């Protein structure tokens, strides 16, 4: 099953947080930070959203940094994704 976002929406898959600190301390699940890095897996067509022309600047495969608590988390075929607006993407990592 595929997710096809509408308008200015983007579907991302989060990159998991590290299990250990740089000094080698193992972190329990509750101590890990909410990941803010992800890979873009689907991009909406853009168009006119709330009266403004939106041109999509992202493409599938981009590595991005996004707002910490942005978007809606969904589970599909056992995989977790986040759907958010292109505005919630802060940067593309090259």
UniProtKB/Swiss-Prot annotation:
GO BP annotation list: chaperone cofactor-dependent protein refolding
InterPro entries registered for this protein in UniProt: Chaperonin_GroES (IPR020818), Chaperonin_GroES_sf (IPR037124), Chaprnonin_Cpn10_CS (IPR018369), GroES-like_sf (IPR011032)
Record's keyword annotation contains Nucleotidyltransferase: no
Main location per the UniProt record: cytoplasm
GO cellular component terms listed in the entry, alphabetical order: cytoplasm
Compartment annotation: Cytoplasm
Assembly information from the UniProt record: Heptamer of 7 subunits arranged in a ring. Interacts with the chaperonin GroEL.
Listed HAMAP family: CH10
UniProt family annotation: Belongs to the GroES chaperonin family.
Protein known as: Co-chaperonin GroES
Organism: Alkaliphilus metalliredigens (strain QYMF)
Lineage: Bacteria, Bacillati, Bacillota, Clostridia, Peptostreptococcales
């Amino acid at each position: 099953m595929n997710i096809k976002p509408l308008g200015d929406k983007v579907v991302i898959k989060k990159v998991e947080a590290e299990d250990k600190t740089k000094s080698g301390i193992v972190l329990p699940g509750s101590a890990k930070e909410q990941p803010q890095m992800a890979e873009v897996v689907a991009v909406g067509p853009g168009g006119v959203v709330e009266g403004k022309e939106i041109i999509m600047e992202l493409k599938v495969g981009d590595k991005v940094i996004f707002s910490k608590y942005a978007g809606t988390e969904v589970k599909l075929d056992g995989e977790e994704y986040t759907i958010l607006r292109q505005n919630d993407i802060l940067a593309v990592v090259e």
